A protein has these predicted regions:
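Short, small/acidic-rich helices and loops at N termini and domain boundaries
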Residues: 1-94
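Glycine-biased, small-residue-rich flexible motifs in mid-sequence functional cores and linkers
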Residues: 1-22, 44, 85, 92-256
Length: 256
């Protein structure tokens, strides 16, 4: 892992400490914008407080960012724990990071994804499926059909591992011999490794479920698919509605 990858992890991962005040997506976006134009040699060394001040940050913010970057022992310990649980980081500057996320989400792409499973699946063409947890019978059949058809056409299925539409489509795809990328909103480390299934989570591998994590991962589900199928959604509220409306607003991928 090179210095830039370590830097992304130190700035964006809680490293097992829920009280660690990491950079938000907006703060990471601002830092990336301010870092543009810096020489490669500057990007490969550890940032100092003066570097952050020269980028336009006040002294308090510069001290906070430097404190995050100094947690190297905690990072090494966290990486070691992750390896034992078969969880590995893919930062926005890593070779394995999906280019389609950089292309579609640009500065809003996650600083780090944690992965469990076959990373080569990340480079395969995919479609996505989202939908409600409580499904009507006809919509459950639709979700299963999307999963089956993805496998039949050699496309990876991207979904969110929630009960209902997500798992229905995922299981149909796997049963048909297809590949699945499942972006979870709970503890990645507790997911059982399965053939043709790659689990991903944002920021860390041991974070508990939260509504914020569930909503945040929706942009990745929508952006990874060349098309997104919506099995069912409540009108005006809920995660499926929120993610789909944002996709339509920002044009990450076509919605069907």
């Amino acid at each position: 892992m090179n210095p830039r990858e370590r830097g992304f992890l130190l700035l964006t991962s809680r490293l097992g400490n829920p009280d660690r005040q990491v950079l938000s997506t907006a703060q990471l976006r601002m830092l990336a914008l301010r870092m543009r134009g810096r020489e490669c040699a500057q990007l490969e060394r550890e940032m100092t407080q003066q570097d952050f001040i020269e980028l336009g940050y006040d002294r308090e913010t510069a001290e906070r960012y430097c404190a995050l970057l100094s947690d190297t022992e905690q990072l090494d310990y966290y990486l070691s724990r992750g390896r034992k649980m078969d969880c590995n980081p893919v930062t926005r500057v890593s070779e394995d990071y999906p280019g389609i996320l950089r292309q579609r989400l640009v500065m809003d792409a996650p600083g780090c994804l944690w992965a469990k499973g076959d990373l080569s699946i990340l480079s395969t063409p995919a479609v996505a499926l989202v939908g409600s947890r409580e499904l009507r019978a006809e919509n459950r059949e639709f979700a299963a059909a999307v999963g089956y058809r993805a496998a039949e056409e050699g496309l990876t299925l991207v979904s969110g591992n929630a009960r209902g539409a997500d798992r229905t489509a995922q299981e149909a795809c796997l049963a048909a011999g297809g590949r699945v990328i499942s972006i979870v909103a709970d503890e990645l480390s507790k997911q059982a490794r399965r053939r043709n299934l790659l689990y991903l989570s944002e920021d860390d591998f041991d974070g508990a479920f939260s509504t914020q994590r569930a909503l945040s991962r929706n942009r990745c589900i929508h952006a990874l698919g060349r098309m997104v199928f919506v099995a069912q959604s409540d009108f005006g509220h809920g995660g499926t509605w929120d993610g789909t409306v944002k996709n339509l607003r920002f044009g990450w991928s076509p919605v069907a």
